[in-house]
């Protein structure tokens, strides 16, 4: 799976992971939420089970709590289905309708947010208050070769960056000055959202553990939505000046 915090892609070639799992008779499960079936098809690459948060990019409007899990093996699929029905995990008809509605526009939303995200990542790379930027299609991305092999030209909509001033105080100033961008540990909405892994998704780790992962107090994750790129850069320009 792609990394929730860093937005980096597969650290090892998936073909190697598939071979290892087959050798050890282990089922390979891939979380495809960040990349979606539009950019990557795990089963075609050898995965046995795929999970995806429909709440995020697929439905795309932050108004459903839904996900799916599907397996290659029909017996495994039957076990999953029986468990869901037995434990009452079936979603409401209304949520299913909302998700189906979102799927109608998913291809358009994906292409638009991905295109904006790439331009946005390049903009951040030139900002004097930003120390580093992680986006899969940037040539300086640590996993650039694996990205091209796994995702082709797709970079998807997630951008991560780190402030030059890596203190919590600078991070707080930045967030307070960033108007019109929701501060929320979610992703995939039509509106751009910002999250701070050190105080949200990775808050349960020690500081040393976070630093090992490359997550400092100045590290942020952006889920790029459907706004015009000029609107995003203007807002981030103003906020970054306060760091």
Predicted segments, located by residue:
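PLP-dependent enzyme catalytic core of the Aspartate aminotransferase-like
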Residues: 14, 165-169, 176, 192-243
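Structural motif of enzymes handling amino- and sulfur-group chemistry
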Residues: 84-163, 167, 171, 178
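Active-site PLP attachment segment
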Residues: 43, 47-98, 102-106
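A common structural junction motif
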Residues: 87-88, 177-186, 239-243
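Catalytic PLP-binding core of fold-type I/II PLP enzymes
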Residues: 11-49
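Single conserved hydrophobic/aromatic residue that forms the stacking wall/gate
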Residues: 1-10
């Amino acid at each position: 799976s792609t990394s929730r915090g860093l937005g980096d892609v597969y650290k090892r070639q998936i073909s190697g992971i598939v071979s290892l799992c087959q050798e050890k008779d282990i089922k390979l499960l891939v979380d495809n939420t960040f990349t979606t079936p539009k950019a990557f098809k795990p089963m075609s690459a050898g995965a046995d089970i795929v999970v995806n948060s429909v709440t995020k990019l697929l439905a795309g409007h932050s108004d459903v709590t839904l996900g799916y899990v599907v397996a290659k093996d029909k017996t495994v699929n039957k076990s999953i289905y029986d468990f869901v029905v037995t434990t009452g995990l079936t979603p409401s008809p209304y949520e299913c309708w909302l998700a189906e509605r979102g799927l109608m526009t998913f291809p358009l939303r994906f292409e638009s947010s991905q295109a904006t995200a790439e331009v946005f990542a390049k903009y951040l790379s030139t900002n004097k208050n930003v120390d580093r930027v992680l986006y899969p299609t940037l040539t300086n991305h640590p996993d650039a070769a694996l990205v091209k092999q796994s995702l082709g030209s797709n970079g998807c909509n997630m951008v991560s960056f780190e402030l030059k001033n890596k203190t919590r105080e600078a991070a707080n100033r930045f967030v307070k000055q960033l108007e019109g961008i929701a501060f929320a540990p979610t992703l995939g909405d039509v509106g751009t959202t910002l999250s701070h892994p050190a105080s949200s998704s990775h808050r349960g780790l020690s500081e040393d553990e976070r630093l090992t992962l490359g997550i400092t107090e100045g590290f942020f994750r952006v889920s790029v939505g459907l706004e015009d790129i000029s609107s995003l850069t203007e807002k981030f320009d103003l906020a970054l000046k306060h760091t």
